[in-house]
């Protein structure tokens, strides 16, 4: 029997200003869905896998075809409902309603675990959407580069006087998310040694200039890191190997990185983490015929790696979990102090979230890189005093290779996002841009996620696991008129550990879009300020007052 999730066809988004659908509001999700499966974007496009273990864009290839066909005929007063990658219904709504509403991987809490999900997945009843895979706004590794860069810069500020020159970062994983780490480290002024078990992923990062060099030798990798740091150069190297083997070996040798983290796909113990002593081919085969054995061996291996990370931490080396739930896996394997070192959000990012600052991103539906160059310039024009952001945009222009449709990631917050959206829409209206653009974000944002081991770890009021907030965020974005809205479970950290929402809005140059953009791009980050103000963060409370938010139970207004 043929595999409904495997097809050798090549998918690429249309370019230019010619419509394949009835309007840009349906053309936009069509192009971004297809862009998610572009071979220059997705990790395993022939299997519908975009990134993050088994994060897919559609449940099966038949479902992909049905979604495409439906979007091509969808009217501007209709909404398509997508249930775990399957187009289940079209309903009449109104012109300001989302054209697509997506729910991926959601399970009743008692059943929200990998065993039950994998059973449903095997029967063809579910799909893992990760965060931006099933919500059709993945833009390649660039999507996490700036967040990783901001994390490394803040780590340098806290631990090394704001200067990472001559220092190096040890990490694992070069997949769709982890692949951003070497480039982010170099942009922050540091060297990076990234351990990756799958050589094809390292080659992908080499091809797209996210990593500088590759080796199979630990000794060679360390020699290069030593030479680069002594010379004050910022360069990166991918080491083909298993992090569960390499990290303990470095501890044994007494090697001391300056920062330690990890972005293997440890959130998924079957599809995301190579067990110690296994070949990649053996691992892939047993995922299908003996997943329980894979999970058992992978979890034991994660415990070994986390113990090594604890050893680095206990040696005084800044060590953080980068949101893949590897500490939780080690804890469940009996490593009682697995959470001794922090996650990256409470350690470095939360003050940004308190002001609604997060991973704002946009993509040029024209396919023309010049449209991104023009929007980059517009950002600088509208935010003239944000020199840190200007520096980021300059580095991004120089170092980041576009994957699929040209796109940009740019961390901005409440008060700035709607201004940029309106300016971009005006650029479409007056012909400065060759076609409309879409604006979206990662689900990793200030008000759109509940994830106690990542974004909402160690909240001031103890509300880490309260998931009302992403539900309210999705509802508000729907009411505000986003072009498509998504509500997912399990992204980043795996089944049972997160709920999160996403939105994308199309700048088609119309006055209707102006009104929608102003609502969506104000309300969306405002929910993040609200959420952190409710938890008692002074930065968020002050920002809420400054921005004039009406928060009756929080500000009493």
From Swiss-Prot:
PROSITE patterns cross-referenced by the UniProt entry: UROCANASE (PS01233)
Catalytic activity annotation: 4-imidazolone-5-propanoate = trans-urocanate + H2O
Binding residues for NAD(+): 52-53, 130, 176-178, 196, 201, 242-243, 263-267, 273-274, 322, 492
Cofactor(s) this protein requires: NAD(+)
InterPro entries: Urocanase (IPR055351), Urocanase-like (IPR023637), Urocanase_C (IPR035401), Urocanase_central_sf (IPR038364), Urocanase_CS (IPR023636), Urocanase_N (IPR035400), Urocanase_Rossmann-like (IPR035085), Urocanase_sf (IPR036190)
One Pfam family, short name: Urocanase_N
GO MF terms, alphabetically ordered: urocanate hydratase activity
Metabolic or biological pathway: Amino-acid degradation; L-histidine degradation into L-glutamate; N-formimidoyl-L-glutamate from L-histidine: step 2/3
Subcellular location: Cytoplasm
Descriptive protein name: Urocanate hydratase
Organism (species): Brucella ovis (strain ATCC 25840 / 63/290 / NCTC 10512)
């Amino acid at each position: 029997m043929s595999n409904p999730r495997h097809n050798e066809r090549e998918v690429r988004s249309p370019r230019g200003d010619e419509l394949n659908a009835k309007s840009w509001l349906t053309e936009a999700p069509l192009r971004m869905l297809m862009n998610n499966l572009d071979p220059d974007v997705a990790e395993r496009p022939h299997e519908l896998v975009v990134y993050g273990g088994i994060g897919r864009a559609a449940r099966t290839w038949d479902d992909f075809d049905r979604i495409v066909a439906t979007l091509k005929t969808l009217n501007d007063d209709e909404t398509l409902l997508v249930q775990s990658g399957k187009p289940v219904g079209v309903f009449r709504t109104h012109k300001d309603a989302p054209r697509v509403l997506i729910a991926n991987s959601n399970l009743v809490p008692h059943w929200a675990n990998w065993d039950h999900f994998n059973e449903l997945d095997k029967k063809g009843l579910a799909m893992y959407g990760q965060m931006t895979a099933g919500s059709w706004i993945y833009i390649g590794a660039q999507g996490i580069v700036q967040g990783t860069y901001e994390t490394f810069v803040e780590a340098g500020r806290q631990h090394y006087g704001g200067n990472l020159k001559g220092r190096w970062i040890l990490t694992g994983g070069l997949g769709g998310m982890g692949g951003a780490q070497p480039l982010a480290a170099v942009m922050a002024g540091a060297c990076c040694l990234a351990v990756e078990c799958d050589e094809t992923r390292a080659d992908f990062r080499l091809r797209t200039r996210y990593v500088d060099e590759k080796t199979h030798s630990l000794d060679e990798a360390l020699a290069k890191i030593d030479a680069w740091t002594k010379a004050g150069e910022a360069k990166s190297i991918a080491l083909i190997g298993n992090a569960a083997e390499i990290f303990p070996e470095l501890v044994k040798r007494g090697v001391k990185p300056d920062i330690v983290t990890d972005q293997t796909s440890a959130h998924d113990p079957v599809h995301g983490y190579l067990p110690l002593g296994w070949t990649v081919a053996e691992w892939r085969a047993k995922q299908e015929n003996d997943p329980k054995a894979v999970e058992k061996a992978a979890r034991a291996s994660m415990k070994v790696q986390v113990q090594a990370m604890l050893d680095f931490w206990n040696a005084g080396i800044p060590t953080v979990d980068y949101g893949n739930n590897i500490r939780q896996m080690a804890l469940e394997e009996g490593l009682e102090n697995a959470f001794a070192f922090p996650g990256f959000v409470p350690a470095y990012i939360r003050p940004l979230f308190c002001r609604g600052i997060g991973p704002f991103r946009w993509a040029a539906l024209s396919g023309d890189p010049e449209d991104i160059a023009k929007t980059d310039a517009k950002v600088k024009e509208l935010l003239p005093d944000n020199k840190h952001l200007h520096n980021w945009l300059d580095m991004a222009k120089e170092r980041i290779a576009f994957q699929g449709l040209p796109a940009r990631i740019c961390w901005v917050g409440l008060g700035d996002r709607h201004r940029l959206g309106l300016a971009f829409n005006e650029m479409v209206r007056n012909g400065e841009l060759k076609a409309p653009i879409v604006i979206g974000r990662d689900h990793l944002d200030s008000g759109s996620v509940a994830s106690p081991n990542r974004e909402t770890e160690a909240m001031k009021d103890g509300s880490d696991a309260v998931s009302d907030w992403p539900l309210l965020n999705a509802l508000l974005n729907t009411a505000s008129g986003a072009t498509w809205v998504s509500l997912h479970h399990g992204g980043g950290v795996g089944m049972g550990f997160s709920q999160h929402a996403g939105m994308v809005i199309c700048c088609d140059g119309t006055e209707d879009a102006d009104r929608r953009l102003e609502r969506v791009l104000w309300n969306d980050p405002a929910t993040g300020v609200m959420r952190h103000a409710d938890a008692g963060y002074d930065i968020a409370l002050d920002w809420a007052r400054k921005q004039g938010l009406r928060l009756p139970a929080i500000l009493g207004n």
